[in-house]
């Protein structure tokens, strides 16, 4: 239908169009100066020393795990309540994902669940900053330091998120996403931030065939025209067309996230009169990026299942999302981990629903959603 309200829509404007035109006019459309500008700008946002732009956050996770030497016989701890790409990358490297439960109300992985899963084979911990809120980094990094295990923050939802006064990523290594539904987007893309120069160098090589330099370095940096492969790598570089869009979006981040926060506040107020349960907020000091606004639809409380609610909203021209179906309940992982039970993850996975939330959402759009929820709830 022509007036269908999606659960997410990118906020694009004249600035993004102008940025693309500038790159097209320059004659250099693949990885080049706009990538360098984006990496520098993102370091200013997070406070990190190094940033490496990549073709997706999944690509960033892949090469980050590779740079840590993750492989056969290793274990990596991650929540099951996450997008499956993290699990897939662990498995594709020959390692074993150790999926742990989350807090029932915030959907954040807890230090208690992480510590219980640590073994001599544990080679990395991947906490997820879920829906735009931060995980408890003090406790998680303390575990990493105590056991000598690297922490890689999955910050795909967390551009603009802070924990105790510091932007996510400032503590170490984090991976952000520029996918089409994220707080800032360039259609597809991502970026890895770190303060470790050797780690950053490995990422740069792995993202571009395993070469020591990329094409722009060879053209503009006074480097030798022929580069050597240092180790087998991938083709995960971000074109400057995408980097230019991400830069334009980054300049709008504060305004975009402020609008998201305003809509989330309206949702919280409206939910007081509805049976649907929003996620709880973390108790520690933080700034929430409001990537998603998630409710839990418990049939005993709401007299409707989550799937039926989503179907009903769709008939009313309103889109929703599911973030996420727990990884360990999906066919591949279900068959390989048949005895794994994660009660709070499973309870939420069966009930969570993402409502429309994006910066260009109007008051009329918001009213449509709330009116529809009241109708479905029989109010």
From Swiss-Prot:
Quaternary structure, from the entry: Homodimer.
SUPFAM superfamilies, sorted: PLP-dependent transferases (SSF53383)
Taxonomic classification: Bacteria, Pseudomonadati, Pseudomonadota, Gammaproteobacteria, Enterobacterales
Organism name: Salmonella gallinarum (strain 287/91 / NCTC 13346)
Protein name (database record): UDP-4-amino-4-deoxy-L-arabinose--oxoglutarate aminotransferase
Molecular-function annotations in GO: pyridoxal phosphate binding; UDP-4-amino-4-deoxy-L-arabinose aminotransferase
GO-annotated biological processes: lipid A biosynthetic process; lipopolysaccharide biosynthetic process; response to antibiotic
Pathway(s) it belongs to: Nucleotide-sugar biosynthesis; UDP-4-deoxy-4-formamido-beta-L-arabinose biosynthesis; UDP-4-deoxy-4-formamido-beta-L-arabinose from UDP-alpha-D-glucuronate: step 2/3; Bacterial outer membrane biogenesis; lipopolysaccharide biosynthesis
N6-(pyridoxal phosphate)lysine, modified sites: 182
Transmembrane domains' residue ranges: none
EC number in record: 2.6.1.87
Gene Ontology cellular component list: membrane
Keyword Transferase annotated: yes
Keywords carried by this UniProt record: Aminotransferase, Antibiotic resistance, Lipid A biosynthesis, Lipid biosynthesis, Lipid metabolism, Lipopolysaccharide biosynthesis, Pyridoxal phosphate, Transferase
Cofactor(s) the protein needs: pyridoxal 5'-phosphate
Family of this protein: Belongs to the DegT/DnrJ/EryC1 family. ArnB subfamily.
Function per UniProt: Catalyzes the conversion of UDP-4-keto-arabinose (UDP-Ara4O) to UDP-4-amino-4-deoxy-L-arabinose (UDP-L-Ara4N). The modified arabinose is attached to lipid A and is required for resistance to polymyxin and cationic antimicrobial peptides.
